[in-house]
């Protein structure tokens, strides 16, 4: 017997693709694939397998290339096969030929609609809305305010929503009711006299077995009577009631870190009545205010920026107004906190403008500057608007939900990219139609609360 040394250049030890796997054991000897992944177990690695799931459909044509689905079913026509699509829910009313169940649309499907009478009873009108995702179950809920109550709607199947229950008004009915969410609790205010702030534990919705139930509040805060709106900074655990009967209508501070034991924490009365606000723990371009709690108030005749970090000593940073000022109503920061997009509720009425959004540059909070304005395609009044990424979602009353691309704000360009009109009769300059938008669900569901129509659940069209 002759003993010898192995030859590293022999075919047995060759590694053509230099992936540290010898060719004789490599499931893709000519394509580097150190992980040797072979989804369909056919002995051919995914890196060089043109049909990874072995269903007879080449990957380049397969709508689920890693899951066998030879029939290529795609119920919602989104290009992703049912076999690997986690979202195959179909809208009740897809946007087709510019209409979704009679509602003018572009780029948005109407998943479903709940009439206002089902939510608030006969004669009710809709107003504000917000959303909550149960962290335990992942179920998404719509919180819809009406003149009579706050309704809680399970939208886990947005095409078949379920009204789980309602929380009646604390005192009288009112056209103005507002809700926000913190730490799995809803906080509700109203302009109804003596209403105060209702606190409702949203986890109670999990145990409802015979919907709809009529709920009672878990706590009531009576540091104010009526309030137009409520704002919450979820990072700090403070709520800010605005337009209340305290502090000259300025923000009324409430510590809600223990949600069912809210504690009065002061207020700010130095500027005009505050109609709405956004409060953030600042992380924008102005280094002077990083980490500070900043309130941006839409105060009828101006926009005010206030440092509210010290609740016992809030400090005005600056104010700004603008041309053709009618009523500074509500606004929202861009995600990077460079720009603030404001809606003026009566400029369309007073000055004959189309739906207008005013944009300020807030890079320097001490010296805010007017940046640009956007005019929409209709004369509808703009109401509440919110930013998600590069899209500004606005409730434009009679013109419904409008989606505006703001990716080119630096260049002074805003472009409408979609809409779903919840008010069919017209787009007139009137107080009918969409009051609020909630565009923050991870699923892509968007809520539209409508004065006349109730709750609309929409999604971008596939």
Residue locations for each model-derived region?
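C-terminal motif of bacterial Sec signal peptides marking the signal peptidase cleavage site
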Residues: 3-4
């Amino acid at each position: 017997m002759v003993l010898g040394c192995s030859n590293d250049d022999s075919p047995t030890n060759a590694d053509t693709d230099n992936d540290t796997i010898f060719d004789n054991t490599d499931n893709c000897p000519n394509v580097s694939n150190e992980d040797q992944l072979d989804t369909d177990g056919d002995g051919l690695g995914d890196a060089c397998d043109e049909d990874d799931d072995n269903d007879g459909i080449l990957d380049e044509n397969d709508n689920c290339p890693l899951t066998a689905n030879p029939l290529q079913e795609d119920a919602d026509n989104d290009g992703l096969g049912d076999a690997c699509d986690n979202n195959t829910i179909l809208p009740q009313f897809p946007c087709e030929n510019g209409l979704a169940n009679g509602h003018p649309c572009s780029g948005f499907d109407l998943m479903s609609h709940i009439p206002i009478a089902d939510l608030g009873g006969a004669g009710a009108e809709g107003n504000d809305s917000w959303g909550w995702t149960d962290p335990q179950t992942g179920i998404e809920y719509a919180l819809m305010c009406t003149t009579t109550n706050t309704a809680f709607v399970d939208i886990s199947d947005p095409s078949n929503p379920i009204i789980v229950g309602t929380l009646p008004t604390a005192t009288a009915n009112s056209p103005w009711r507002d809700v926000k969410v913190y730490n799995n609790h809803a906080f509700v205010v109203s302009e109804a006299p003596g209403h105060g702030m209702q606190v409702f534990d949203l986890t109670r919705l999990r145990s409802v077995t015979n919907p709809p139930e009529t709920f009672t509040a878990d706590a009531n805060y009576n540091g104010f009577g009526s309030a137009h709106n409520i704002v919450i900074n979820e990072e700090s655990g403070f709520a800010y009631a605005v337009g209340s009967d305290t502090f000259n209508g300025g923000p009324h501070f409430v510590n809600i870190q223990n949600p069912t034991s809210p504690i009065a924490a002061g207020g700010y009365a130095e500027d005009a009545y505050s109609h709405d606000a956004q409060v953030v723990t600042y992380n924008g371009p102005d280094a002077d205010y990083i980490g500070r709690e900043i309130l941006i108030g839409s105060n009828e005749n101006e926009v005010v920026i206030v440092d509210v970090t010290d609740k016992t000593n809030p400090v005005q940073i600056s104010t700004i107004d603008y041309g053709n000022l009618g009523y500074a109503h509500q606004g929202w920061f861009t995600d990077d906190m460079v720009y603030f997009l404001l809606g003026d509720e009566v400029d369309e009425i007073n000055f004959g403008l189309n739906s207008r959004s005013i944009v300020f540059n807030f890079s320097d909070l001490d010296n805010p500057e007017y940046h640009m304005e956007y005019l929409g395609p209709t004369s509808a009044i703009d109401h509440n608007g919110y930013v998600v990424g590069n899209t500004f979602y606005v409730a434009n009353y009679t013109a419904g939900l409008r989606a505006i691309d703001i990716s080119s704000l630096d260049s002074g360009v805003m472009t409408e990219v979609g809409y779903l009109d919840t008010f069919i009769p017209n787009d007139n300059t009137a107080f009918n139609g969409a009051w609020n938008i909630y565009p923050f669900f991870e699923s892509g569901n968007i809520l539209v609360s409508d004065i006349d129509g109730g709750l609309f659940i929409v999604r971008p069209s596939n």
